[in-house]
């Protein structure tokens, strides 16, 4: 029986030796008593030393998923953005951590380029290529040639499969509705606007329907379940939240 898991906001772990292919990755566990581990995390300010990499690595993850805000770099200066990613990527503990791991990821607003930004951010295509460079995405990968950083990888472990579906909640996201009082945003009218955009929705539906994995993990950089805080969330697009629930 297929199982779908939705990873909402951000924070996680990952593990193991991998052999890279575009969409299918075979993982060999060190021994039969070691669990296959996926780790994920987000909100990692590049100017503050991250002391957690060794602790995460001690869980022997085979896969690490960046969940967004991988750097804090609200800017329209792409050199500044590149430099901040370089600071992050050249951290000695991070370099040790990513050795022999599969690295996946998406962005959120502060690494996309502007606070709470969506489709209107004018440097989104340039920012996309910089993120893909940071993740080590091959230059001939399809993610390089299409709009948005959404991606999928299927991990094969002892003849079992885990499909990881990483969404992009920035590139196509239309306008939000301003909230009242101490709430920054409120839900759009039902049916108004989109979070993922038509192309990404079609891709997501196809990836889920065609999956033969035992587990399907969906990664979103913004919260899915929480809808009371008045900040960014799937709940600001109630029709798309409902659509994803039905799809799962």
Question: Where do the protein language model's features map onto the residues?
Answer:
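Metal-dependent phosphoester/phosphodiester hydrolase catalytic core
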Residues: 17-248
């Amino acid at each position: 029986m297929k199982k779908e898991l939705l990873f909402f906001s951000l924070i996680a772990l990952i593990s193991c030796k991998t052999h890279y292919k575009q969409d299918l990755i075979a993982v060999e566990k060190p021994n039969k008593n070691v669990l296959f581990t996926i780790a994920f995390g987000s909100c990692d300010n590049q100017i503050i030393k991250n002391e957690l990499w060794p602790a995460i690595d001690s869980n022997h993850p085979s896969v690490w998923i960046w969940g967004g805000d991988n750097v804090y770099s609200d800017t329209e200066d792409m050199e500044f953005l590149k430099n901040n990613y370089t600071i992050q990527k050249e951290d000695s503990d991070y370099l040790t951590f990513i050795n022999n791991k599969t690295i996946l990821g998406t962005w959120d607003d502060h690494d996309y380029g502007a606070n709470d930004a969506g489709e209107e951010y004018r440097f989104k295509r340039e920012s996309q290529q910089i993120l893909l460079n940071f993740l080590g995405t091959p230059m001939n990968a399809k993610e390089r040639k299409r709009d948005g950083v959404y991606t999928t990888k299927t991990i094969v472990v002892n003849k079992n499969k885990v499909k990881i579906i990483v969404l992009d909640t920035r590139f196509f996201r239309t306008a939000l509705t301003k909230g009242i009082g101490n709430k920054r945003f409120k839900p759009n009218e039902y049916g108004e606007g989109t979070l993922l955009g038509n192309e990404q929705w079609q891709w997501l539906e196809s990836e889920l329907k065609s999956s033969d994995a035992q587990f399907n993990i969906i990664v979103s950089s913004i919260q899915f379940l929480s809808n009371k805080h008045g900040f960014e969330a799937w709940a600001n697009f109630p029709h798309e939240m409902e659509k994803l629930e039905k799809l799962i």
